[in-house]
């Protein structure tokens, strides 16, 4: 029921009294708020300090991430402040936790500059995470309205065009990270690239921390690397690539490296998440103008995404990076050495690949999201995976993914080329089995053993790594579980 005119007038008068007024009474809490299609929505997991009411805590988060300060200021009257105040509109207890709550907050679209991740994040995560009223705070999910998404370019290339450029369909793409990360000379680096690609991989890649160090300057790496790409592509008759990391200390240096990457004929370049949101958007714009696939390594994300109660969930990073315009982003393996609950990872992949997602609490998706025709972003699975897990990887991750076997290629006893061949044969035999309608998940180990009878490198890899899997409990799991319901 709507408030009476007298009631609204009384509330408004109280709201502008001098001094400190609870955020909820200042207009940052509205349980009757009607969500607009143009609102930016955010859902926070909050742990209020002892004695702080959850509703007041949610209102404080809304206030401090929009227009509020600690006391009433008369200059509010010079603005459309009732419109611009963020509205906390719902607070739910977190299942299984006694001191945590989900706070839902709506933001007026005009609070954000068009096409600027830096501005969006300055509000949503800029100040509230240090707020004393909360013991811990985590941004779990966001709903970005179509009107706002249309101000971002989205992935520079997208999954469909990438496959067209590579002429590779119906299977995951295969890659590997050059190992060791640091210390190789340019010539030896190029040899690793050549061996891996000639053995059957689609891509080799730089790791996150190889830039331009004294043991190998960037131009040396690029020149030897592209030689390896070209020789392997000519030998295999396939389009091949190497992710040249153009990350540097300044945008000027990054543009210089990216331009050189284009000049030598590379189809793809790479940046790290740590360069920052504005730099990522700038490189994505450059990549689109120059028809370059842009790979993003999520270096640094676990410093704020891994813990359950404070920071932000990686699904939010997935959304922001799709908006920013990267074509690839590392998004988890489930079975590898890095953090990744199966349901959470599925939610990440759906966020990157679907044109529209519905609410799916078991995957951690708290809002429905229409992606406004932005291109799809290719997830990358890397970190502790090997060919013996191929049936699991395809089952969990599907076709639209780059499977990066670093140690699982370069650690092969018979050499890099043999490691690449083992991975390619494992992938091909599993895709064939799936396409034939076989239960490849259950039969996976036997399918691999059968293929290994005519592929020595695969047999050696299976003998070496067997069924190694990093079975550690995930620190970030779903708060909701699926329950069986009777059909009526």
UniProtKB/Swiss-Prot annotation:
Its cofactor is Mg(2+). GO terms for biological process: reductive pentose-phosphate cycle. Keywords: Calvin cycle, Carbon dioxide fixation, Chloroplast, Lyase, Magnesium, Metal-binding, Monooxygenase, Oxidoreductase, Photorespiration, Photosynthesis, Plastid. Coiled coil: none annotated. The modification N6-carboxylysine is found at residue 205. The record marks 337 as: Transition state stabilizer. Binds 1 Mg(2+) ion per subunit. Gene3D superfamilies: Ribulose bisphosphate carboxylase, large subunit, C-terminal domain (3.20.20.110), RuBisCO large subunit, N-terminal domain (3.30.70.150). Heterohexadecamer of 8 large chains and 8 small chains. This is Ribulose bisphosphate carboxylase large chain. It comes from Guillardia theta.
